[in-house]
Amino acid sequence: MQQHIIESTHVKPTINPKEEIRQRIDFLKAYVKRAGAKGLVLGISGGQDSSLAGKLCQLAMEELREETGDEYTFYAIRLPYGEQHDEHDAQLALEFIRPDKSFTVNIKPAVDASVEAFHRATGLELSDFHKGNTKARERMKAQYDIAATFGALVVGTDHAAEYVTGFYTKHGDGACDLTPLTGLNKRQGKALLHELEAHERVIYKVPTADLEDGRPGLPDEVALGMTYDQLDDYLEGKTIDPTIAERIETIFKRSRHKHHMPASLYDEWWQ
C-alpha cells in the first residue's frame, strides 16, 4: 500500500529545489499558453502552501510577459472571514510574492447569509465544521469570479500530504484548474521556499486550515492526528510507526472519492 500511495502522489525521496522550481514555473507557463488564458488567480492565506504557489505563479507570469511581449497577470486574492487574526503573516507573504495585482474579498457576509439561509430552510444550525467547509467553498467561488472576469485560471495549493489525507474541502480549496505543488511533500515545499528566499516566518508558520470559529488556528497536525514529518517520511518511502502508517492508509482509502470526478454507473474506483 505504501508504494502505491507514493506512486499516486509522485513524491521523490530526494529533490533538487532549483530544478523543481524551474519545472513548476515551466508547467504554469505552458498550461496558461495552451489554455489561452491571460493570467493566474490564487488565494493567499499567509501559510507555506499559498506563499510557495503564489511565488511560482508570479515568476511564471513575469517570464511569459518577457518572452512574449503580451500581458499576463498574477492576481493574489486575500479572502478573510471578517478580521483575520494572523493578517500580519498574510501581508508578509504578499511582500515575498510581490504579485502583479491583489484584491481582498471579505467572505463573511456571503458565508453568514448562506448559513442563515440553511437555518431558515431546515430549522437547524449548521455545524461549525460544515460552516468551515462553506468558507472554503465561498473562497473558491470568489476566485473563480475574479478569474472569469480577467480571463485567468484558478491555481490550487494541493500537495502530496494533503492529497493522501484528503485534507481539503471538496469543491472548496480542492476545486481549481491546475496544481503546481503536486508531487511535493511538506518538507520539500519548505526547501523550495528556502531556495526562493522566503521570510522565515512564512516558511515555518504552523500550518492551519483555520476554518472553524470554535477552534481558530487549529493546527493541521492536531486535526490529522499525526505530524507532517511522519507523513513526509512515509511518502519518501521510509519506515515509520506502524500505527501511523495504518492511519495514513485508512485516511487515504476513506478520502479517495476526492481524487475522482463524480462517481457514475460506469466507474469502478468506488467499488
From Swiss-Prot:
A single GO cellular-component term on record: cytoplasm
UniProt-listed Pfam families: NAD_synthase (PF02540)
Pathway participation: Cofactor biosynthesis; NAD(+) biosynthesis; NAD(+) from deamido-NAD(+) (ammonia route): step 1/1
Keywords: ATP-binding, Ligase, Magnesium, Metal-binding, NAD, Nucleotide-binding
Domain of life of the source: Bacteria
Residues where ATP binds: 43-50, 157, 186, 208
Binding annotation for deamido-NAD(+): 137, 170, 177, 257-258
EC code: 6.3.1.5
A Gene Ontology molecular function term of the record: glutaminase activity
Catalytic activity: deamido-NAD(+) + NH4(+) + ATP = AMP + diphosphate + NAD(+) + H(+)
Biological processes per GO annotation: NAD biosynthetic process
Enzyme class: ligase
Function: Catalyzes the ATP-dependent amidation of deamido-NAD to form NAD. Uses ammonia as a nitrogen source.
Homology family: Belongs to the NAD synthetase family.
PANTHER family: NH 3 /GLUTAMINE-DEPENDENT NAD + SYNTHETASE (PTHR23090), NH(3)-DEPENDENT NAD(+) SYNTHETASE (PTHR23090:SF7)
Subunit structure: Homodimer.
Protein's name in the database: NH(3)-dependent NAD(+) synthetase
Organism field: Exiguobacterium sp. (strain ATCC BAA-1283 / AT1b)
Record lineage: Bacteria, Bacillati, Bacillota, Bacilli, Bacillales
